[in-house]
């Protein structure tokens, strides 16, 4: 990632700290992956703090595929089978079956309905019967070890929530341009400025975690 583009958001460690602070205060962040990977920016919000307005923003400016990033423990708690037995996707994106809240939604498509589904899935006492399958929210299972195991947006989302002291569940959606094409670094940065959202990279987060673990040892 071209660090010059991101320099106005601080150095790598500062970018992570600003993102964590934003998440603690209920704001969203934008996460870029490597230019030689997907080279995309995702809008990411804390699942427990996300508002209907933020969900509407996500649907309006995103790909429409609103994903809920979960730990393996939560996936098992909800008894969500993986979408396929053999994952042949290029980046091994770990989708489970899609979900809908069993109560409190109509068609499940609206911003409010999708948020109701997410809140049902992350509730402390959530059980499998709280969710219908299929639905309009796409759960993703994060790899244990986070970005140190897999450098994906799913793992970055769960890592950010954990580091921020929040529930280890987050909502992500790929940012798109008005013409439907995927947003890359310049467009992501412009969107971030317009909506007062911090920007960081998965590379930043990897370095931050490595430094923290080295310091702890």
Curated annotation (Swiss-Prot):
Any one GO CC term of this protein is:
cytosol
Write down the position(s) of the site called Essential for catalytic activity. Answer: 136, 174
Indicate yes or no for the key word Metal-binding.
yes
Q: Can you tell me which residues bind Mg(2+) 2?
A: 38, 153
Known Pfam families for this protein? Answer: DHBP_synthase
Top-rank taxon: Bacteria
The name this protein goes by in its record: 3,4-dihydroxy-2-butanone 4-phosphate synthase
Q: What is the lineage of its organism?
A: Bacteria, Pseudomonadati, Pseudomonadota, Gammaproteobacteria, Enterobacterales
**What gene name is listed for this protein?**
ribB
């Amino acid at each position: 990632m071209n660090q010059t583009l991101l320099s106005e958001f601080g150095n790598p460690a500062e970018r992570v700290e600003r993102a964590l602070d934003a998440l603690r205060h209920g704001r969203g962040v934008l996460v870029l992956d490597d230019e030689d990977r997907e080279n995309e920016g995702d809008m990411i919000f804390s699942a427990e703090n996300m508002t209907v307005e933020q969900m509407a923003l996500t649907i309006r400016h995103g790909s429409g595929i609103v994903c809920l990033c979960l730990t393996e423990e939560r996936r098992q708690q909800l008894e969500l089978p993986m979408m396929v037995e053999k994952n042949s996707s290029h980046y091994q994106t770990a989708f489970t079956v899609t979900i809908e809240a069993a109560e409190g939604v109509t068609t499940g498509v609206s911003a409010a309905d999708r948020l109701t589904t997410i809140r049902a899935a992350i509730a402390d006492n959530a059980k499998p019967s709280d969710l219908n399958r299929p639905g309009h929210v796409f759960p993703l299972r994060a790899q244990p070890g986070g970005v140190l195991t897999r450098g994906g947006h799913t793992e970055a989302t769960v890592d950010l929530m954990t580091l921020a002291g929040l529930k280890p569940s987050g909502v992500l959606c790929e940012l798109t341009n008005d013409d439907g094409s995927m947003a890359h670094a310049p467009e992501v940065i412009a969107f971030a400025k317009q909506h007062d959202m911090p920007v960081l990279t998965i590379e930043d987060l990897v370095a931050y975690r490595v430094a923290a673990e080295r310091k702890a040892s």
